[in-house]
Structure formats: C-alpha cells, structure tokens
Amino acid sequence: MANKIQRSSHIYSFCIADALAVMSVDLGSESMKIAIVKPGVPMEIVLNKESQRKTPVTVALKENERLFGDSAMGMSIKNPKIALRYFQDLLGKHIDNPQVTLYRWRFPQHELVKDERRQTVIFKLSHEMQYSPEEILAMVLNYSRGLAEEFAEQPVKDAVITVPVYFNQAERRAVLHAAQMADLKVLQLINDNTAVALNYGVFRRKDINATVQNIMFYDMGAGNTVCTIVTYQTVKTKDSGTQPQLQIRGVGFDRTLGGLEMEYRLRDYLVKLFNKQQPSKDVRQNLRAMAKLLKEANRLKTILSANADHVAQIEGLLDDVDFKAKVSRQEFEDLCSDLFQRVPGPVLQALSSAEMNLDEIDQVILVGGATRVPKVQEVLLKAVDKDELGKNINADEAAAMGAVYQAAALSKAFKVKPFIVRDAAIFPIQVEFTREVEEEDKSKSLKHNKRILFQRMAPYPQRKVITFNRYTDDFEFCVNYGDLAFLSQDDLQAFGSLNLTTVKLRGVGDSFRKHLDYESKGIKAHFNMDESGVLSLDRVESVFETVVEDKPEEESTLTSKYTVLLPKYIWVARNSVLTPPPPTGPFTVLFIF
C-alpha cells in the first residue's frame, strides 16, 4: 500500500491547507466504492467495517435499527422484505414508469405505493415505515460518509458523487436531494463514465500530447451498460499553459443490460431444476428460498466466467431440502443468448452520437464487473473489430478514483495538476412557445416555435440565453427535452415526461408600459447547465435601449442599454417528473420577487 501512495503522490502535487478531507462515492447499482483525499494521503479507497474495498448498496430497515452493507445483505436472505436493493432505478420515476414495473417483477417482496403528492414511488414496509427512494439513498450516503470519516479520522462534508450518464434532470435532482438530506455538500455530480475517463487520463498524463487519441470505454456493470468514446489531447489555456484535456465525444447505453439480468436468468434456471427434482414443492412461493437462489446465481455467474462448469449447491433451500445441480458455461450462455446479442448496441450508439467510425478508435478498454463474462468479451471483440480488448484499468475502482481526483480539484484545500474535462449532455433540451401571428389576409393565428437550448452532446458547464423579441405582454414558455429519436422505445418509455417545466412570465406588460420611450431589445431568459449537468433558470429580464445625446462637450451620440429585471413570474411544473422540494419543480429559480 505504501508503494501505491508514493506512486500517486508523484503524479499529483497537492498543496495541503488547513481544511477537511474530501470524498467520492461511486454509486453502482449493486455496490459502492468510496475514496478520500486528505492531508498526507493523496488518494485512497476507503475500507469498510469488514475491511472490504466495496460495499453493497443495500439497506435493511428494522423497527428500531438500520443495517447497511454486508449486514444488510445478510438480511436479504433472512428477511427479504426489509432489505432494499437496486433502488436507484426508481429515483425520479412516476409510479407508472416501466422501470417501476420491472422492479416489482424483480423484487416482488417489496410493496411499492404511490406518493399521492408527487405521483412517485414509496417503499411501504409497514404503516409507520414508508420511505421514498431518495430517503433510502440519503441513508446510504450518510453511511458512506461515516465510513469515510472513520477511515480518514476526521470530519468529511464535501463529496463528488457519480451518477449514470443517462440520468436525466429529475434523476440528477433526486440524487442531489438525497445528498442534501444526508447533510453532504455535493461539489459535483460526475457521470461515472467521465470519472473513469478522468482516472485513465490522469495516470497517463505523460502519454497525452497534441496528437488526438480516441479511446472507447465499454462499461458493463451489475445494472446497466454504457459505452463512451473519449478524445484525449493537450490544449493551450490562457491561465495555465498547455494542459491535457478529455472530451466526451459519444455515448451509448442500455439501462437494463448487466450482470443482474444474467443472474436472474440463472436463478430461474435453478428454480426449474429444483422444482424438477422436487415436483411436490414450488420454490417460487418462498421468498427466502428465492433470495438464496439469486445469491447462488451471482456466485455461479462469477465462477462460470473462469470455469467450464460448476455445481450449484444450497443447503436447506426449502423445507430442509438441499439443492445441488451442475451447470455448464454453455448452458449459462444459452440462457443469456438474447442479452449477449445486445452487447454491440451501446457501441453503435456511441459511434453514431460521436459521428465517428471504428477505424478512428485507437483502443477499447473494459470497465465494470460484468465485462469479465467471457461471452461478453467475445461478442464485444467482434463488434469493435479490434485485435484485443484493453484490460489495463481497475474495472471496479476507476470511477471512484477519478471522482475523488475531481473532488480534490474542486476543493480549496488541495492543489492538483490541471486536467481539463469537457463533458457532454446526451439529451437535447429546447424551449417551446406559442405566439400570435398575422396572416396575409390580416387574420390571426397561433404559431408554435422551438428554440434549441442544448443540442445532443452539447458540452457543459455552459450558459445559454434565449431572447424573445416579439412579446410585449405576459406570456409563457415550456422547457422540454428535444428530439429523442435516438432512444429505443423501451428507453423512451422509461425516460418519463418530456416536459421539464412551464414558465409563466408576469410583469412583461408593465415593464413595456413604463419604458415607452425606449427601444426593446427583447426579453432574455438566462439558463445555466452546471458542472453536475443540472439545468437552472437563473433570471429573466427585459432589455431596453435608448439614444443619449451629449452635445456640449463631445458632440457625440451614445447608445445606452437599460436592463429591467421582470418583477415577477410564476413558475408552473406542468407534467413535471419528480423534483425535490424546494423548489417544487425542475428549475432552481434564483430570482428575487
């Protein structure tokens, strides 16, 4: 371990100040990895109470006790109803979302009810114990901070948290809400694929030069698959000279393709074998037995990645009856044949969004535990048409280490060597509004207008201004997602509402009546997509211009601009997906009424 720390400190030059440690949390579907930076320790993965480098994202809720990590996983076998897993898939989802339907199928032991106020999901464990997915995540984040503080031996408040690149505005805000409940200051939500790319680049800083390198990262984890094309090169900056840069060029994903789905195929196969051995019993009717079979399927999947066959065995599976059955890798691959056919999909999506072809990709690197499945590698290698797949990155910890490097860079306590990150928003966003127009026959009609705010793969952080030139009275506009034709039908249904919010402006007419002697330069709405990929409406203003003559001295005519902040607007979250209060909709409104 000492050698690892020494090697890291050679790469990073930290300037230690009197401040607290910072942390990162890589929130995977199945498990999380936590990393810290503190004075004297450049970067380190946090060990949990069992001295493990990763911790199951599982919460077991008893009447007077909360269990986390391995302890909670143990309860998922003993009492499956109280152990909550994979709940991140429910963040920001309405009760009728297909992701909720899938969750109910995967975990029938949990009762999901509707939050009548927000139309979202509530876990109902009892009449007194009801929690939203955000509250469950807040518990996990609070626990992760406790582990970090125990490991760092000092308080930790600031964190960078990873999220899937395909998280939309509602999902990102749900994570921020959870962090707020956990009293964590989020320095940034970083896309997990970007964190991996940053970790890769930081440790290869010397290999990055003015020549473009295009690297494809293929990340298949427990719950999802993401393919990312990243361009590395050095660029000149005004403040710090020539520095390395990574740019996210293309992204493809499959929300439900991962190790968990493979485990369910194996579990159902084991169910079939047991029921065949014991025709008088039906293991499906016993929640504990089904939980045991899912756990064994997880173990079996891992072993079959290294062996041609293995014997699955569970003592006392049902009514003290033991279960034993031999399963081959070929049987496993046959069970998951349709899943393996989906492996190339994210690659094709990433190439399409980057407008690149395979010849331009210099290397393909594997990330994520499920890429260890041999058939995944076989299908992927054929899809990318390369001689080999890169395995020169820590598939489990790359995102956590990249995120903690970013945490150090954002913290005022440390100074790190600059590494420029240009992330990209994969979902386009547009502003839509309707205004009255006059036809040739002098009749009036309504015209629907669309203005692109952020295109697909637009870099962020970035500020944008939309100008409305033809309004002289109160009006409204909608902020919606743009063209999502690149999504599959399943992804589109899981995406949720395409409407982010509706903004009703009040006070427009008053501002015009008060400035009749001025020339209007339009009504400007100022938007900001921050480092976390979260969109906000900063302010709305009317801009007027007038000509001021200064005759006595310079005999010149000057043009003067006059900006009027609109005194009031009403913001309506119509058809909005979950947004944590306050505010009660998808925009953070930084506006003084």
What are these regions (language model features)?
Residues 57, 119-121:
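A generic secondary-structure signal marking the coil-to-beta-strand transition
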Residues 62, 111-119, 127:
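Short, ordered beta-strand-loop transition motifs
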Residues 132-134:
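Hydrophobic alpha-helical hairpins/lids featuring a short glycine-rich hinge
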